[in-house]
Amino acid sequence: EIHERLVGSEMCIRDSAYQMAFDNSGKMTAWTYAGKQILHTNANGTIASGAAPDFNSCRNIDNDKESTANVGCVNSSSTKIIKALTKDDASGCATMTVQGNAKNCQYTIRYTFYPDATVDMETTFSPSGATRRLGLGLQLASGFENVEFYARGPRSNYSDRKTGSYLGRFTTTVDDMVEEQIHPQTYGDHEDLRELLLSNKEEGLTLTVQVDGQASFSLSHFDESKWIEEGSNLWKIPTHWYDLVRKPQVFAHIDYWQRGLGNNSCQGDVVLPKYECPTSGDHTYTLRLKPNL
């Protein structure tokens, strides 16, 4: 049975197995299952800065060059609760809706909390301008290394580079998903995501993500913000793979849309309009998150 309560300035949702907490702006501050951390945390057990699910439009690849010179990247947003946490005694579920504002995009997340530790995140993106990607980013705790996914694979693929990739179920590790380009760039997208399982064998914990709607994902142990530059500055920054530091946490993107690659690395064709991120309208996917031992 779900119990919701206010602890100081935080709202807590808990039952005998799991706990989630949010601050008064709607940002997640804690998420545990059977006492085990799901997201990357500080030494005191609170979710680390940038680890909670948040809007994330960060990406940089050589093909983008001047095409995205004026399209900035953000990995955080301002949020507020627009529908307070409410429990439905008949179903035993609780709901809450959070609204976020980021550069060129407003979004809402309608949370549904179930008694069995399942959490639905019905997320609607309402862009007002150009972005490099429309989606959520988060950082999973150290140890979520083993990956099984039902999407296009086994190699990375993008909205304009996916017809040669099979839709199927694949297994790998986060480390094995690295693509060492000459210069660090955004990598590892997998389109048409249906289900993603991340396993932490040391803790005996698995997080399952099921998707209703359009989505893609990528996973990495490297902090993408270290090579994000606007415009065509990518090659002006003398960064190599050996300059990067592998982090213990897992940096995850679950996107509704990521801009296609195009062919502009050598002054070729830019991304076709149908593969650019939408700049208007409402675009929704639902993520169903379920931790299991």
Question: What are the residue ranges of the model-derived segments?
Answer:
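Beta-strand/loop-rich accessory regions of lumenal/periplasmic or secreted enzymes
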Residues: 9-10, 14-293
